Design a protein with these regions (language model features):
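Short aromatic/hydrophobic "clamp" motif used to bind/position activated sugar donors
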Residues: 87
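Glycine-rich, basic loop-to-helix element that forms the pyrophosphate-binding segment
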Residues: 66-82, 147-150
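Short, well-formed alpha-helical segments that are part of the catalytic scaffolds
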Residues: 15-30
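A recurrent flexible, glycine/aromatic-enriched loop bordering the glycosyltransferase active site
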Residues: 121-124, 138-158, 171, 177, ...
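Catalytic donor/gating beta->alpha subdomain of glycosyltransferases that bind UDP-sugars
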Residues: 167-170, 176-228
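Acidic donor-binding/catalytic loop of UDP-sugar-dependent glycosyltransferases
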Residues: 48, 92-107, 180
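A conserved acidic beta->alpha catalytic loop
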Residues: 25, 42-51, 94
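Conserved donor NDP-sugar-binding/catalytic core segment of glycosyltransferases
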Residues: 98-128, 200
Length: 317
């Protein structure tokens, strides 16, 4: 059986710290597979990322430049220069196994799917934030999925072209929206653990986790998003309402202070607790439930802060 030519698109923006590990693994996998091309698209890096790629990875890596726009536009720009039958999107802070592209070809051939990939996992010796958040959201088995993150996603070129690529209006969440359009066209998306990648640049502290979720929230809420409102958005609104109710509960004059505190605390943690139960029902690992509850509280506070910031901007402008 003839294996397809694979075009690997790696978007880069200020990832010099992680690029050597990421590109070393990708280059080794490209050489092991044979019929593949590596396209690195620099998004205006200022930390020497582009120079690092030019000095260490040419000519095997082809470097393109893209200024401004979104990460979706960066990936689409790489695709325009690609010649492969299969497009493999791998982020610049992810490492992959040596047999990755052989496994990719096998999965596409045997699953009948038009898109595949896998979740990204934290590195060895992760921080507790990385470990708890990953265990909550990891997928236990191979199988058909609604979406796969674009940090580690592959799609048949014909399907990519048929749905029009990534939506360049979206600052974040472009992968879920793209996968939705694939499924709307009847294309299957299949996850295989053989394609698992290691993500090096996770949030490692509660503070960095909060900042990253604020950024994601600004992107998710601040751009045009076709289709239905997703569960995180609904739960963020619910959390804001319950948070306000909790504050009001403290002001109820007829209640004793212990009662007020218990009611307020219950309202504040209601949405995070519901999210935790949902993850448990979906197979998530609740090995550290109090820490998991804390992260979900931080998650909803961060998303709520992003929503409030955007509303404030709208009122001002």
């Amino acid at each position: 059986m003839t294996r397809p030519r694979v075009s690997i698109v790696v978007p880069v923006f200020n990832k010099a710290r992680f690029l050597p590990a990421a590109l070393d693994s990708i280059v080794a996998a490209v050489r092991a597979y044979g019929d593949a091309e590596l396209i690195v698209v620099d998004h205006g890096s200022t930390d020497g990322s582009r120079d690092l790629v030019a000095s260490r990875y040419q000519p095997i890596a082809r470097i393109l430049d893209w200024k401004g726009g979104t990460i979706a536009a960066v990936r689409n720009h790489g695709v325009h220069a690609a010649s492969g039958e299969v497009l493999s999107f791998i982020d610049a802070d992810c490492t992959i196994p040596l047999d990755y592209f052989g496994s990719l070809a096998d999965v596409l051939a045997t699953s009948g799917a038009m898109a595949t990939g896998a979740e990204v996992v934290p590195p060895s010796s992760p921080s507790w934030v990385e470990e708890v958040w990953y265990r909550l959201h990891r997928r236990a088995r191979d199988g058909e999925q609604e979406w796969i993150g674009s940090a580690n996603l592959a799609v048949v070129r014909a399907a990519f072209d048929a749905v029009g690529g990534f939506d360049e209006r979206l600052v974040t969440g472009e992968d879920t929206e793209f996968c939705q359009r694939l499924r709307d066209r009847g294309y299957r998306i299949y996850e295989s653990k053989r394609l698992t990648a290691v993500h090096l640049d996770n949030a490692k502290t509660v503070g960095s986790f909060y900042r990253k979720e604020v950024w994601r929230g600004l992107g998710m809420f601040g751009t045009v998003r076709p289709g239905a409102i997703d569960k995180p958005t609904v739960m963020t609104v619910v959390h804001l309402v319950l948070l306000a109710a909790g504050i009001l509960a403290l002001a109820v004059a007829g209640w004793a202070w212990p009662v007020r505190l218990v009611v307020a605390a219950g309202l504040v943690v209601a949405a995070p607790a519901a999210a935790l139960l949902y993850r448990a029902a979906a197979g998530g690992d609740l090995g550290r439930p109090l820490r998991a509850l804390l992260l979900y509280e931080v998650y909803f506070v961060a998303r709520g802060a992003a929503m409030a910031r955007l509303l404030f901007r709208g009122v001002r402008g």
